[in-house]
Each structure stands twice: as C-alpha cells, then as structure tokens.
Amino acid sequence: MTKINKWLPVVALWLLPTVGAAQNTQPLVVPFSMQELVARCLVDFEGQPLCQEANNGDLNAQYAISSQYYDAGSAYSDLAMSWAFYAASRGSIPAQKQLAEMFLKGRGVPRDKVQSYEWYRTAAKSGDGEALYHIGSMNMDGIGAIMDRTRGIAYLQESARAYWAPAAYRLGLAFEEGEGVMVNMTQAVGFYTQAANAGIPEAQFRLARFYEEGRVLTKDNKQALILYTHAAELGHGNAQFALATLLRSEGGRLDEVIKWYREAAKAGIVGAQEQLGLILLRGDNGKAEYTEAYKWLAEAAQGGSALAEFGLGRIYEEGLGVVRNRKIAKLHYQKAVELGNISALLKLGKISLSEDKSEEALKYYQKAAGLGRMEARRQVGLMYMEGSGTKKDLVTAEKWLELAVSSGSTNAKYDLSRLYLLTKDEEKAVRLLREAAEAGVAEAQIELAARYAAGRGVEQSASQAYAWCMNVKECRPRVSYDCSRYGTMLDEHDREISLNRLKFLQENNHCSMH
C-alpha cells in the first residue's frame, strides 16, 4: 500500500440509513462526506488516479481504497467504513461483505450483529457464496437473526453449490452432529470430501478420521495418513497429533512421529505434549532427554493429563534431570490419582513402604486393588500374610492372593503356595508352586528344584531338581552353586553332560549362572 500520512481530520458526522437494515437498529453514522474522503485520499495515496476514479463513482476503486484503509489498522477504520458504505450502498458486493465484517467485529463502527447480518444478506442476493455462507452460519447460530437452522441449512447448501468450501465443511458438521438436519453420515462424508478437496484442513482432518475408523467409508489407513498429512502441513494441531499417533501405530519412523508430536505439542494439544514428554523421558529415540521431557509433561499436566502427572512423579522419584525429591513425586502421583491414574496408587504405596509408612502404603494398595489392579491385589495379600501395616490375617491374605491369581498374576501363585505351607496344606502349596514354576517365576523354580533335590512334598528326583534349576532365567545368587550340586546327584552319564553344560554357561557368562 502507498504510504498513508499520519494525520486524522476533524470528524464531520452525518447520518445515512443502512441499506436493508432491520427494525430497531441504529442508522449508520458516516464520518466523512465524499468530498472529504477524496481530499484525504489524494493526500494519503499521493494523488493516485484511484482517488479520482472513486470520486467518479467507480465502485471497484471505492472498495479498493476502503480495503487498503481497513488493512492499515484501527486508526483508519473510520475511513475504511466510509468508503465501504459508499460502495456498498451503491451495489458493490465486496464492499457489502466488508461492511458486514466491520459490524460483526466492531471495527470502525459500533459492533452490531443485526447490521452485519443485513449487509451479508444484501450481498447474498446476488448469489455470492461467501455471503450466503455467513448468513447461513448466522442463522444456524442465532447471530444477528433469530436462530433458524432450517433456513441456515438452506443458505449453506446454496453457498456450497456456489463452491464456497467453508459452507461444505459446515454442512458436513451439521450432518455428522444432527445440527438442523437428521444425522446422515453419508451426507457428512460427501460434504467433508468437497471441503477437503478445496483445502479446508478441518474437513481433511474429519474425513481422515472416517477413513481411519472405517465409518461409512472402507477403513483405509493409507488414505487417512494422506489426509492427516495435508491438514498437518497446514498447521492443524489435532491432525498433527492424529498423524503422529497413526504413524506410530503403523510402525512409522520414530523421528517422523516425534516431529509431528512436537508440532502438535507446540499447538497446545495436550495429548501430544503428554506423548512427546513420555517418549523423551523413556528415551525411545535412543537417548533420554529429561529437560525437554519435563517441559512437555509439565505443560500437559497443566492441561489435565493424568499420564503427564505420573511422568512428573517418576522424574522426581528417580531424580531424572532434577534433584530427587520424593515429597514432590508424591504430590504429582496424588494429582495423577485424582485424574484417574490407578498406577500412581501403586507408586504411592511403594514410596510409603520405603518411608516405613506401611499403614499408609496398605491404604494405597487397597484402593488400587479395589479398582482391579492385579499387582495391588497381590501386594495387599502379601501385607496381610506378613502383618505389614495391619494385623497378620491369613484368611484375608488368601482372599486377596486368590483374586490376584484370578487376575492373571503368576507371582501370586507362588505367594499363595507359601501361604498354604503356613496353613499346613502342602498338597495345594506344591500344586501352585509347580504352576508358578511352569509360568517362569524364578522363586518358584528355585524352590521346586530344592524340593525335588530333597524329596519334600514331591518324589525325590535329581534330574528334575537339575532341570528346574537350569530353567531359572533371572540373575540369582547361589543358582550356579545349586545347579552344580544338583548335577553331582545325577548318574555318571547325565552328570558329565550336565556339568559340561554348566561349565559352558559359566564360561559364556550366562546370567543365571552367577
């Protein structure tokens, strides 16, 4: 735009009625006469022919001047409004739409939604797609006119037929959500497709969801990725988040996943902030980045993310990039619990136990157990069995350990076998011990091996003792010694084979042979 001089004239107020104005609206106050406007134009635009063309009644010139003043900022709003009014009142559709926008936003004129609606309606009479979209939307939302969604839909459909893409998107939304029409997902997809093809990012995002979820359309993750990518590249935060999530589930490159999570996180998408923080905290990309992880988890926590609060709790509990502070860790875990994260109850229980607060720990574990957490059920059972935080109660311990077993805890089978030994039910104890050993519980395998070696509760068998000992996969003290001892109990042929195998494992630093 040509330089606009920094002077403001004395405002001369005069009144003109608004074209198509509704009842009970104030007449438009136009600050300048045409003579004053032309004089000002010649100064501001340095004598451009545009000013004289506007003075001669050229509507395009009048609108062009108005538009340049409008773009120059609020200091020139009176001039923009005056030029827009002269052009609009003489039939300039662009000027009518600009005047409608000025009334809607209160720029250069008092904010007046009714006047805005009337000017958009005047422009719409010519079939202008944008104006039809605005009055359709205003009817849908009851802005500047009585809410009439049937009329709003009609205007939006007319606008969409004029190839105004935002109208197609709004119609897609209406048919998806049943806004002024019956829910019709097929229609919604059709309008979203029209809008998406025209480059509307929100339509691309919503259409991608239909492809990803297989609703109405055949499930097609490839097409969903294409649409998410288009919308993401246009800066659509939710599309960036959805793109990262889908790429991750499809086994896409982690650097691409992180890139889009980061873009969505910058756009304020809480889920992206949460996931990016957790990825960086775990070091999924090869190296943990605690400082950036903390930043994103803190932002997500402010947005109400339970997982982010849990992650912050872990950072403080373990001292990951910060000074270790269990007190702060507990605060974050407690917030996570308030937001529905059950795992945080287990963390609180663990911290309480480390602080010798077994009664407090039991309360946390009982709450998690009541919510169905297998690990918590097992821990409650153990605490009742050992009398930790409560009176020793083997009946209650048995109940919780059985619940843990029914939830799938193989470790609880081993614990329950120990309990049955306390209650002198060796048959049950050995049965559960064997089940736990077969499921890979190291303690059960070691105990079962010892029982076979000694013939306690089972028929004595050196080969079984040796076999169960060699099954232990975890690093355990004395396992190498015990396996050697059981090996010497075998007959000469088997003993030679077993000891050679043991020697090989030891020489190759087999973990269980420490």
Feature map (PLM): residue ranges:
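Bacterial N-terminal signal peptides
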Residues: 9-18
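N-terminal leader/linker segments that initiate helical-solenoid repeat arrays
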Residues: 20-70, 82, 511-514
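Terminal, low-structured helical/coil segments at or just beyond the last alpha-helical repeat
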Residues: 26-28, 474-514
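Short helix-capping/linker turns of helical repeat alpha-solenoids
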Residues: 55-58, 70-73, 89-92, 105-107, ...
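Hydrophobic face of amphipathic alpha-helices that form TPR/SEL1-like repeat modules
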Residues: 64-71, 98-105, 132-141, 168-177, ...
